[in-house]
């Protein structure tokens, strides 16, 4: 079977377009089109190599189990969900904070997926008070035109007495003015607000010298999920992705190598699972430890 035929069959089976293949090759769509038809007049050998590599890579992907992170009910995630639920029911501002990679985002996304009256904003370092208002307007189906006061008033009018919940992930990225904007919306509209982020979120809410009393005094509950997850949580998450993690030695190796971090655990599980699928060897504690040596974080 020619490489062109193999590539055509792969594209048909996977539903890949010539544009997608061209992007993977780093070539133009015209080159891929001509190559597939056997009409390419350039360096056919170099395109053959690209095709071979692409086909082999796709074959490796097919061998590998598709492992994706998903929400798993654990002791920590249940605590987080309860703090969110209380903010929703009581119209309070609650906070969830802790180290990166412990599942805060997953908890918020799960709550949003289960409650259609919950709004989720995922902030980044470029977020200003105006960006927060524009994002909220987008979620509420409101116009993003107008000055900040007009946008704020529009959001308050849409949310007042609605019983809705506003959640902001990575809220440590928000400057003081953005946090104050959220406080004002909470006060005026009477909705619950959940802020989730790294530990410095608490400092941002209090102020370095405790000068933001008006803001921090609004916080009802603040859940600190710490620097790492307990072994039971790591075990539950690991087994949900990799049945071999039920073996005591493999489970123990994953916990130790993950440092109690769910994000690092996912990288470990994906790596050892892929190696197992491709090599044909069973997942072992030794394989976990060996792969862990290659992880930077």
What are these regions (language model features)?
Residues 1-30, 34-49, 53, 214, ...:
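C-terminal alpha-helical "lid" subdomain
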Residues 60-73:
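Conserved adenine-nucleotide phosphate-binding loops and their immediately adjacent elements
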Residues 88-110, 124-125:
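Walker A/P-loop nucleotide-binding motif
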Residues 95-100, 185-213:
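Sensor-1/coupling segment of RecA-like P-loop NTPase cores
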Residues 113-121, 141-143:
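Post-Walker A helix-loop "phosphate-sensing" segment adjacent to the P-loop in P-loop NTPases
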Residues 121-125, 204-209, 220-232:
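Conserved AAA+ ATPase "SRH/arginine-finger" region at the nucleotide-binding site
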Residues 128-129, 134, 143-187, 192, ...:
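Mid-core helix/loop region of P-loop NTP-binding domains shared across ATPases and GTPases
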């Amino acid at each position: 079977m020619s490489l062109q035929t193999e590539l055509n069959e792969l594209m048909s089976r996977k539903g890949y377009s010539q544009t997608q293949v061209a992007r993977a090759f780093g070539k133009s769509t015209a080159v891929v089109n001509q190559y597939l038809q056997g009409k390419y007049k350039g360096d056919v050998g170099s395109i053959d190599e690209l095709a071979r590599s692409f086909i082999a890579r796709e074959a490796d992907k097919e061998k590998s189990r598709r492992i994706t992170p998903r929400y798993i009910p654990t002791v920590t995630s249940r605590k987080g969900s309860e703090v969110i639920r209380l903010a929703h029911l009581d119209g309070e501002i609650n906070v969830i904070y802790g180290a990166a990679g412990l599942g805060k985002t997953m908890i918020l996304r799960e709550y949003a997926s289960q409650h259609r009256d919950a709004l989720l904003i995922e902030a980044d370092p470029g977020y200003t008070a105006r960006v927060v208002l524009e994002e909220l307007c987008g979620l509420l189906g409101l116009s993003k035109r107008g000055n900040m006061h007009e946008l704020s008033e529009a959001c308050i009018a849409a949310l007042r007495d609605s019983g809705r919940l506003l959640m902001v992930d990575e809220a440590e990225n928000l400057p003081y003015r953005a946090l104050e904007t959220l406080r004002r919306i909470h006060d005026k509209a009477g909705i619950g607000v959940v802020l989730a982020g790294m530990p410095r979120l608490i400092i941002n809410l209090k102020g370095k010298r405790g000068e933001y009393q008006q803001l921090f005094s609004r916080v009802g509950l603040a859940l600190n999920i710490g620097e790492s997850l307990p072994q039971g949580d790591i075990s539950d998450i690991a087994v949900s992705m990799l049945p071999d993690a039920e073996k005591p030695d493999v489970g123990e190796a994953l916990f130790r190598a993950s440092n109690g971090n769910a994000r690092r655990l996912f990288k470990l599980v994906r790596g050892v699972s892929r190696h197992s699928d491709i090599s044909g060897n069973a997942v072992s504690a030794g394989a976990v430890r060996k792969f862990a040596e290659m992880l930077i974080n």
